[in-house]
């Protein structure tokens, strides 16, 4: 009997206590609205700061000038992406810290299995080939907005670094990191089916992720929803945010490489 008691006690020690969600339902709604506002404000702030630094005096005398010329200037946009990244990553970490969470745990910043990584890379390649074929058949050119940026950037490497490496890092941190976790943890009670949280989080964050890409048309936005769902699936399968970040970098890298190959 003593041994049984001990065994049950040790069992209590080994199962970690269930973590209370960092955010209430209302909290998740406010977090989503707040993060989206922060997303747009940080972009504007980034363009303003970079515009002040980079644009010639004739183009940066008024705020309207800075936004008008800056948003079509490759160097300004590249720098604004980097400024935005720093601001948004800092805000995300701060929000988690304020709510008493562990950022590494909450954002799933941990290694993933190579097998899952290779499998997801395969899935991404299938998607990329399919969307490429569809883009060709429908005669779309989704990267038209890059033209003025490419033509005006001081170094094409700056544009590549900002769009291929930096943008995926903070976009994943927000959409498949902070918002995804905040939504998933609303569905941890036993009354919900096992995958309910992941499905809801994936659909909601993917739609929001697509909507923020205002520079695209409806066809491109629908492919972005599918792409975002693939990134969500990678987060679920690997239990890590690092895999979606890597896949996002591969995707943006392939798109940029193709754009440069066509432009050259």
What are these regions (language model features)?
Residues 84-88, 159, 223-231:
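Hydrophobic core segments of transmembrane alpha-helices in multi-pass, intramembrane catalytic enzymes
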